[in-house]
Regions:
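C-terminal core of ALDH-fold dehydrogenases
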Residues: 322-431
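N-terminal Rossmann-like NAD(P)+-binding subdomain of aldehyde/semialdehyde dehydrogenases
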Residues: 1-124
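Alpha-helix C-terminal capping segments
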Residues: 143-154, 176-178, 196-203, 220-222, ...
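Conserved NAD(P)+-binding/catalytic subdomain of aldehyde/semialdehyde dehydrogenases
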Residues: 179-266
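Short internal beta-strands
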Residues: 154-163, 267-273, 280
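Conserved small-residue-rich beta-alpha loop and adjacent elements
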Residues: 108-173
């Protein structure tokens, strides 16, 4: 794990590389992903079944591809009651939060009597990609399905890989909680292709959301425009601003909570106190030995971990804004004041009792967040990803009489005669 002072001679170069990180090099997988997409687009189910047999090692058909609601119910009934209660609590909290962010259709008349407005409409069909196998996270299903449900999407389809034809039990239970009626055992770029183009079994969707590996991210990038997507997600990342008021063990474990996700995950502490930074590093070395995913976390910490000692909290904030992290924790006595100064972060976790893990599961806000610095221009997944906005315009005689001449001047200046004429004939009719 790198330990750097901002006053170090090589700090600027190191931090510039950190800021300019990407969501992964897609060039190596682009040819293979492009071929998968083209095969599914051209051959539909035939290609889909071939790819599932190749990658997931089971032989599907149109019937076995679909996950039945009875499977979801059975999984839900069979899990531990405490876990069932936790999933239901998470569902309710995520639902409550997203209901508060529903955009509302509006209309109003301006001073010329022109009626203007915006109409928000849920999409007809949404495709949710949810990783499976060892990386099967029911929380990802909740975080993608709930905003689609709240938005009022007509049809929601889930695709998840099923190695050997088996789907993770907790994932099935989460599907039941969300009331999912349509789900398929297909993963990777194949699933993205099916949802983007449609096959004989899986209908085309209007949007594809959800996390995935580099193959899924590349596929989503390539089908964008054919359908909408949420974002191109890369490895998980956390940045923590903390000072001596924080418990160094707490901060160490918070950093490891992202490092255990992925060998490419990044965990960065920015602190104005060098002794505190050293204490956090000692606790990381102790705590990492206790993790079941210690080998993954160790690679992440060694390759992508950093403790940065800044001159003061103002510099900590400046560096965090430049980094634009997916997750930003602020563990200082004046955490709320520092949070007000943050412009670029996927989610901000404020105060000593707000570990990032609470946001991952059941605080309420979405855990699908922009990575790789894209928090500068992307927002977390929300109901807006499952809706579209349509402009509303209605002029009466008064409105076109008062605004028509200006409109004709602009049309004339752009050399668009029919535009000008469409206004002129109406003005003439009013004389």
């Amino acid at each position: 794990m790198k330990f750097l002072l901002t006053s170090n001679e090589n700090f600027k170069d190191y931090f510039a590389a950190l800021v300019n990180r990407s969501n992964g090099d897609m060039s190596a997988v682009m040819p293979a992903v492009s071929q998968i997409l083209e095969d599914v687009r051209a051959k539909g189910d035939e290609a889909l079944f071939e790819q599932i047999e190749k990658f997931d090692r089971w032989k599907p058909d149109a019937n076995s591809l679909k996950i039945g609601t009875d499977e979801m119910q059975k999984a839900y009934d069979g899990i531990d009651s405490c876990l069932r209660n936790a999933l239901n609590l998470a569902f309710e909290r995520i639902k409550s939060y997203h209901e508060k962010s529903l955009p509302k259709t509006w209309m109003e008349h301006d001073e010329h009597g022109v009626l203007l407005g915006a109409k928000y409409t849920p999409l007809d069909r949404a495709g949710l990609y949810i990783p499976g196998g060892k990386a099967a996270y029911p929380s990802s299903l909740l975080m993608n399905a709930v905003p689609a449900l709240v938005a009022g999407v007509g049809e929601i389809v889930v695709c998840t890989p099923a190695v050997g034809g088996k789907v993770n039990t907790l994932l099935l239970a989460a599907m039941h909680i969300c009331g999912i009626k349509e789900a398929y055992k297909v993963g990777g770029a194949s699933a993205v292709a099916a949802m983007a183009y449609g096959t004989q079994t899986i209908k085309k969707t209007d949007v594809i959301t959800g996390p995935g590996n580099i193959y899924v991210a590349t596929a989503k990038k390539l089908v964008y425009g054919e359908v909408n997507i949420d974002m191109i997600a890369g490895p998980s990342e956390i940045c923590v601003i903390a000072d001596e008021s924080a418990d160094p063990r707490h901060i160490a474990v918070d950093l490891l909570s992202q490092a255990e996700h992925d060998e490419m995950a990044s965990a960065v502490l920015i602190t104005p106190n060098q002794a505190f930074g050293a204490a956090v590093q000692r606790h990381i070395n102790e705590e990492i030995k206790t993790l079941a995913r210690q080998p993954i976390a160790q690679v992440s910490i060694d390759k992508k971990g950093a403790i940065i000692v800044a001159s003061d909290l103002d510099e900590c904030v400046r560096l965090a804004n430049e980094l634009a992290p997916e997750h930003l924790e602020i563990a200082t006595n004046d955490a709320m004041e520092l949070a007000r100064q943050i412009r670029h972060a996927g989610a901000i976790f404020i105060g000593h009792f707000t570990p990032e893990a609470m946001g991952d599961y059941l605080a309420g806000p979405n855990h699908t967040l922009p990575t790789g610095g894209s928090a500068r221009f992307y927002s977390p997944l929300g109901v807006e990803n499952f809706m579209k906005r349509t402009s509303l315009i209605s002029l009466n005689a008064k409105g076109i009489s008062e605004l028509g001449n200006a409109c004709m001047k602009l049309a004339d200046a752009e050399g668009l005669g029919a535009h000008k004429r469409s206004v002129a004939v109406r003005l003439e009719a009013l004389k």
